[in-house]
UniProtKB/Swiss-Prot annotation:
Residue numbers spanned by region Disordered: 214-239
UniProt record, GO biological process: fin development; negative regulation of transcription by RNA polymerase II
DNA-binding region: 236-295
GO CC, any one term: nucleus
UniProt name for this protein: Homeobox protein Hox-A13a
Cell location: Nucleus
One Pfam assignment: HoxA13_N
Keyword check for Hydrolase: no
Organism encoding this protein: Takifugu rubripes (Japanese pufferfish)
Any GO MF annotation of the entry: DNA binding
PROSITE patterns assigned to the protein according to its UniProt record, in alphabetical order: HOMEOBOX_1, HOMEOBOX_2
Protein backbone atom coordinates (compact mmCIF):
# COMPACT_ATOMS: atom_id res chain seq x y z
CA UNK A 1 0.00 0.00 0.00
CA UNK A 2 1.30 3.47 -0.92
CA UNK A 3 0.70 6.59 1.09
CA UNK A 4 0.78 9.92 -0.76
CA UNK A 5 1.49 13.16 1.03
CA UNK A 6 0.77 16.69 -0.23
CA UNK A 7 2.55 19.71 1.22
CA UNK A 8 1.86 23.32 0.26
CA UNK A 9 4.88 25.68 0.08
CA UNK A 10 6.23 26.84 3.41
CA UNK A 11 5.84 30.55 2.57
CA UNK A 12 2.15 30.27 1.64
CA UNK A 13 0.37 27.95 4.01
CA UNK A 14 2.14 25.31 6.10
CA UNK A 15 -0.55 22.68 5.74
CA UNK A 16 -0.11 18.93 5.39
CA UNK A 17 -2.47 16.44 3.80
CA UNK A 18 -2.30 12.66 4.07
CA UNK A 19 -4.10 10.50 1.54
CA UNK A 20 -4.73 6.88 2.50
CA UNK A 21 -5.76 4.03 0.32
CA UNK A 22 -8.51 2.27 2.22
CA UNK A 23 -7.19 -1.17 1.51
CA UNK A 24 -7.52 -2.51 5.00
CA UNK A 25 -4.33 -1.20 6.63
CA UNK A 26 -5.29 2.14 8.21
CA UNK A 27 -3.73 1.18 11.56
CA UNK A 28 -0.43 0.36 9.91
CA UNK A 29 -0.46 3.65 8.02
CA UNK A 30 -0.98 5.65 11.18
CA UNK A 31 2.10 4.01 12.67
CA UNK A 32 4.24 4.75 9.61
CA UNK A 33 3.24 8.41 9.39
CA UNK A 34 4.59 9.32 12.83
CA UNK A 35 6.91 12.29 13.13
CA UNK A 36 5.38 14.62 10.53
CA UNK A 37 4.59 18.10 11.87
CA UNK A 38 2.98 20.85 9.90
CA UNK A 39 2.62 23.85 12.21
CA UNK A 40 -1.05 24.54 12.99
CA UNK A 41 -2.29 21.34 11.46
CA UNK A 42 -5.66 19.98 12.55
CA UNK A 43 -7.38 16.68 11.90
CA UNK A 44 -10.19 18.20 9.87
CA UNK A 45 -7.85 19.96 7.40
CA UNK A 46 -7.56 16.83 5.32
CA UNK A 47 -11.26 16.86 4.52
CA UNK A 48 -11.17 20.58 3.82
CA UNK A 49 -8.33 20.19 1.34
CA UNK A 50 -10.04 17.31 -0.42
CA UNK A 51 -13.19 19.38 -0.74
CA UNK A 52 -11.32 22.18 -2.56
CA UNK A 53 -9.12 20.63 -5.22
CA UNK A 54 -8.40 24.04 -6.78
CA UNK A 55 -6.11 24.91 -3.88
CA UNK A 56 -3.92 21.93 -4.70
CA UNK A 57 -2.88 23.15 -8.16
CA UNK A 58 0.24 25.17 -7.22
CA UNK A 59 1.47 22.60 -4.70
CA UNK A 60 4.29 20.13 -5.10
CA UNK A 61 3.99 16.36 -4.87
CA UNK A 62 6.17 14.53 -2.39
CA UNK A 63 6.57 10.89 -1.66
CA UNK A 64 6.05 9.50 1.78
CA UNK A 65 9.77 8.90 2.28
CA UNK A 66 11.17 12.29 1.15
CA UNK A 67 9.16 14.96 2.92
CA UNK A 68 10.88 17.98 4.55
CA UNK A 69 9.68 18.84 8.03
CA UNK A 70 9.63 22.40 9.33
CA UNK A 71 9.86 21.56 13.01
CA UNK A 72 11.16 18.69 15.08
CA UNK A 73 10.10 19.27 18.65
CA UNK A 74 6.39 19.86 18.01
CA UNK A 75 3.90 17.20 19.12
CA UNK A 76 2.71 14.80 16.47
CA UNK A 77 -0.86 15.16 15.25
CA UNK A 78 -2.26 12.45 13.05
CA UNK A 79 -4.90 12.94 10.39
CA UNK A 80 -7.85 10.67 10.24
CA UNK A 81 -8.59 8.97 6.92
CA UNK A 82 -10.35 11.31 4.51
CA UNK A 83 -13.94 10.60 3.72
CA UNK A 84 -13.37 11.33 0.04
CA UNK A 85 -10.63 8.75 -0.14
CA UNK A 86 -12.74 6.18 1.72
CA UNK A 87 -15.76 6.63 -0.50
CA UNK A 88 -13.89 6.73 -3.81
CA UNK A 89 -10.73 4.73 -3.34
CA UNK A 90 -10.95 3.24 -6.81
CA UNK A 91 -12.31 6.37 -8.58
CA UNK A 92 -10.18 7.92 -11.30
CA UNK A 93 -8.76 11.38 -10.60
CA UNK A 94 -7.56 13.78 -13.29
CA UNK A 95 -3.88 13.93 -14.05
CA UNK A 96 -2.11 16.65 -12.09
CA UNK A 97 -4.64 16.52 -9.21
CA UNK A 98 -1.82 16.15 -6.71
CA UNK A 99 0.37 18.80 -8.35
CA UNK A 100 3.17 18.26 -10.80
CA UNK A 101 4.39 14.68 -10.64
CA UNK A 102 6.95 14.93 -13.43
CA UNK A 103 9.88 16.17 -11.36
CA UNK A 104 11.27 14.14 -8.47
CA UNK A 105 10.22 15.00 -4.98
CA UNK A 106 13.60 14.76 -3.28
CA UNK A 107 13.78 18.34 -2.03
CA UNK A 108 15.29 19.79 1.12
CA UNK A 109 14.56 23.08 2.93
CA UNK A 110 17.40 22.87 5.47
CA UNK A 111 15.30 20.89 7.88
CA UNK A 112 15.36 17.40 9.29
CA UNK A 113 13.80 14.53 7.34
CA UNK A 114 12.49 11.45 9.04
CA UNK A 115 12.25 8.51 6.69
CA UNK A 116 9.71 5.77 7.06
CA UNK A 117 9.66 2.19 5.93
CA UNK A 118 9.37 1.50 2.19
CA UNK A 119 5.94 0.65 0.87
CA UNK A 120 5.09 -1.36 -2.26
CA UNK A 121 3.74 0.71 -5.18
CA UNK A 122 0.03 0.82 -5.75
CA UNK A 123 -2.29 1.97 -8.51
CA UNK A 124 -2.33 5.57 -7.32
CA UNK A 125 1.44 5.80 -7.08
CA UNK A 126 2.02 4.41 -10.58
CA UNK A 127 -0.69 6.47 -12.26
CA UNK A 128 -0.50 9.88 -10.62
CA UNK A 129 3.04 10.20 -9.29
CA UNK A 130 6.38 9.53 -10.95
CA UNK A 131 9.01 9.06 -8.25
CA UNK A 132 11.43 7.00 -10.30
CA UNK A 133 13.56 10.03 -11.25
CA UNK A 134 16.53 11.02 -9.10
CA UNK A 135 17.97 14.37 -8.19
CA UNK A 136 20.73 13.97 -10.79
CA UNK A 137 18.11 13.42 -13.45
CA UNK A 138 16.32 16.57 -12.30
CA UNK A 139 19.45 18.68 -12.70
CA UNK A 140 20.18 17.21 -16.10
CA UNK A 141 16.69 18.08 -17.28
CA UNK A 142 17.11 21.62 -16.06
CA UNK A 143 20.44 21.99 -17.90
CA UNK A 144 18.95 20.86 -21.20
CA UNK A 145 16.64 23.88 -21.36
CA UNK A 146 18.73 26.35 -19.38
CA UNK A 147 19.61 28.74 -22.19
CA UNK A 148 17.45 29.71 -25.19
CA UNK A 149 14.88 26.92 -25.07
CA UNK A 150 12.89 28.39 -27.99
CA UNK A 151 15.73 28.56 -30.55
CA UNK A 152 16.23 25.22 -32.27
CA UNK A 153 19.58 24.29 -33.74
CA UNK A 154 18.86 24.58 -37.45
CA UNK A 155 21.04 23.67 -40.42
CA UNK A 156 22.14 27.27 -41.01
CA UNK A 157 25.60 28.34 -40.01
CA UNK A 158 26.20 31.51 -37.96
CA UNK A 159 26.10 34.63 -40.08
CA UNK A 160 29.49 36.41 -40.21
CA UNK A 161 29.68 39.85 -38.71
CA UNK A 162 31.07 43.00 -40.33
CA UNK A 163 34.61 42.26 -39.15
CA UNK A 164 34.53 38.80 -40.75
CA UNK A 165 33.91 40.17 -44.27
CA UNK A 166 37.22 40.07 -46.18
CA UNK A 167 38.45 43.26 -47.79
CA UNK A 168 39.81 42.69 -51.29
CA UNK A 169 42.28 45.41 -52.33
CA UNK A 170 41.76 46.79 -55.83
CA UNK A 171 44.32 48.32 -58.18
CA UNK A 172 43.39 51.96 -58.63
CA UNK A 173 44.70 55.47 -58.21
CA UNK A 174 45.33 56.88 -54.70
CA UNK A 175 42.43 59.29 -55.02
CA UNK A 176 40.06 56.53 -56.13
CA UNK A 177 41.11 54.26 -53.26
CA UNK A 178 39.93 56.89 -50.79
CA UNK A 179 36.49 57.02 -52.39
CA UNK A 180 36.20 53.23 -52.48
CA UNK A 181 36.87 53.00 -48.75
CA UNK A 182 34.12 55.50 -48.08
CA UNK A 183 31.70 53.70 -50.36
CA UNK A 184 32.40 50.37 -48.69
CA UNK A 185 31.39 51.79 -45.32
CA UNK A 186 28.17 53.34 -46.64
CA UNK A 187 26.97 50.59 -48.95
CA UNK A 188 27.48 47.76 -46.46
CA UNK A 189 24.27 46.22 -45.13
CA UNK A 190 24.51 43.58 -42.37
CA UNK A 191 22.63 40.32 -42.80
CA UNK A 192 19.43 39.91 -40.82
CA UNK A 193 17.37 36.88 -39.89
CA UNK A 194 14.13 38.42 -41.09
CA UNK A 195 12.04 36.47 -43.62
CA UNK A 196 13.12 38.81 -46.43
CA UNK A 197 16.59 39.39 -45.02
CA UNK A 198 18.27 36.75 -47.20
CA UNK A 199 17.06 38.49 -50.37
CA UNK A 200 18.55 41.86 -49.48
CA UNK A 201 21.70 43.20 -51.11
CA UNK A 202 25.00 42.26 -49.50
CA UNK A 203 28.19 44.23 -49.86
CA UNK A 204 30.78 42.71 -52.18
CA UNK A 205 34.19 44.25 -52.72
CA UNK A 206 34.39 43.03 -56.32
CA UNK A 207 31.50 45.24 -57.37
CA UNK A 208 33.25 48.50 -56.49
CA UNK A 209 35.50 48.83 -59.59
CA UNK A 210 32.47 48.31 -61.82
CA UNK A 211 30.57 51.05 -59.99
CA UNK A 212 33.51 53.43 -60.41
CA UNK A 213 33.69 52.67 -64.13
CA UNK A 214 30.01 53.47 -64.55
CA UNK A 215 30.48 56.73 -62.69
CA UNK A 216 33.38 57.70 -64.96
CA UNK A 217 31.39 56.96 -68.10
CA UNK A 218 28.51 59.11 -66.89
CA UNK A 219 30.89 62.01 -66.22
CA UNK A 220 32.44 61.67 -69.67
CA UNK A 221 28.99 61.72 -71.26
CA UNK A 222 28.11 64.84 -69.32
CA UNK A 223 31.27 66.62 -70.48
CA UNK A 224 30.64 65.71 -74.12
CA UNK A 225 27.21 67.36 -74.05
CA UNK A 226 28.36 70.59 -72.38
CA UNK A 227 30.69 71.76 -75.16
CA UNK A 228 34.36 72.54 -75.62
CA UNK A 229 34.63 75.75 -73.58
CA UNK A 230 33.61 74.26 -70.24
CA UNK A 231 36.74 73.01 -68.50
CA UNK A 232 35.22 72.34 -65.06
CA UNK A 233 35.12 68.56 -65.58
CA UNK A 234 38.74 67.45 -65.49
CA UNK A 235 38.20 63.88 -64.28
CA UNK A 236 36.88 62.24 -67.46
CA UNK A 237 38.31 62.41 -70.96
CA UNK A 238 36.38 64.42 -73.48
CA UNK A 239 34.82 62.74 -76.42
CA UNK A 240 36.70 63.34 -79.69
CA UNK A 241 34.91 65.66 -82.09
CA UNK A 242 35.88 65.06 -85.74
CA UNK A 243 36.56 67.97 -88.05
CA UNK A 244 34.38 68.64 -91.05
CA UNK A 245 35.64 68.52 -94.63
CA UNK A 246 35.53 72.32 -94.98
CA UNK A 247 37.60 72.78 -91.81
CA UNK A 248 40.16 70.15 -92.87
CA UNK A 249 40.51 71.72 -96.34
CA UNK A 250 41.25 75.16 -94.87
CA UNK A 251 43.72 73.76 -92.34
CA UNK A 252 45.58 71.68 -94.98
CA UNK A 253 45.86 74.70 -97.28
CA UNK A 254 47.46 76.80 -94.51
CA UNK A 255 49.76 73.93 -93.53
CA UNK A 256 51.00 73.55 -97.09
CA UNK A 257 51.87 77.26 -97.11
CA UNK A 258 53.58 77.25 -93.73
CA UNK A 259 54.03 74.40 -91.25
CA UNK A 260 54.26 76.82 -88.32
CA UNK A 261 51.26 79.08 -87.93
CA UNK A 262 51.49 82.66 -86.77
CA UNK A 263 49.18 84.48 -84.40
CA UNK A 264 47.43 86.47 -87.12
CA UNK A 265 46.84 83.38 -89.30
CA UNK A 266 45.51 81.47 -86.28
CA UNK A 267 42.90 84.14 -85.59
CA UNK A 268 41.86 84.28 -89.23
CA UNK A 269 41.54 80.46 -89.54
CA UNK A 270 39.60 80.31 -86.26
CA UNK A 271 37.11 82.84 -87.59
CA UNK A 272 36.73 81.06 -90.94
CA UNK A 273 36.42 77.47 -89.67
CA UNK A 274 34.43 78.24 -86.49
CA UNK A 275 37.15 76.63 -84.35
CA UNK A 276 38.95 77.93 -81.29
CA UNK A 277 42.52 79.16 -81.54
CA UNK A 278 43.63 76.38 -79.27
CA UNK A 279 42.09 73.77 -81.55
CA UNK A 280 43.90 75.25 -84.52
CA UNK A 281 47.22 75.21 -82.67
CA UNK A 282 46.76 71.59 -81.58
CA UNK A 283 45.84 70.53 -85.09
CA UNK A 284 49.05 72.03 -86.50
CA UNK A 285 51.10 70.25 -83.82
CA UNK A 286 49.50 66.90 -84.55
CA UNK A 287 49.93 67.43 -88.27
CA UNK A 288 53.68 67.99 -87.88
CA UNK A 289 54.05 64.87 -85.74
CA UNK A 290 52.14 62.83 -88.31
CA UNK A 291 54.34 64.08 -91.15
CA UNK A 292 57.47 63.28 -89.15
CA UNK A 293 56.30 59.69 -88.62
CA UNK A 294 55.63 59.29 -92.32
CA UNK A 295 59.10 60.59 -93.20
CA UNK A 296 60.79 58.25 -90.72
CA UNK A 297 58.84 55.32 -92.07
CA UNK A 298 59.94 56.09 -95.63
CA UNK A 299 63.55 56.32 -94.51
CA UNK A 300 63.45 52.90 -92.87
CA UNK A 301 61.94 51.35 -95.99
CA UNK A 302 64.51 52.89 -98.35
Amino acid sequence: MTTSLLLRPRWVDPSVMFLYDNGGGSDEVSKNMEGFAGGNFAANQCRNLMGHPASLAPSTAYSSCDVPTSAIGEPVKQCSPCSAAQNSSSASLPYGYFGSGYYPCRMSHHSSIKSCSAQPPSAYGEKYMDTSATSDDFTSRAKEFAFYPTYPSGPYQPVPSYLDVPVVPTISAPSEARHESLLSMESYQPWTLAPNGWNSQVYCAKEQPQAGHMWKSSVSDATSHTGGDSGSYRRGRKKRVPYTKVQLKELEREYAANKFITKDKRRRISAQTNLSERQVTIWFQNRRVKEKKVVNKLKTIS
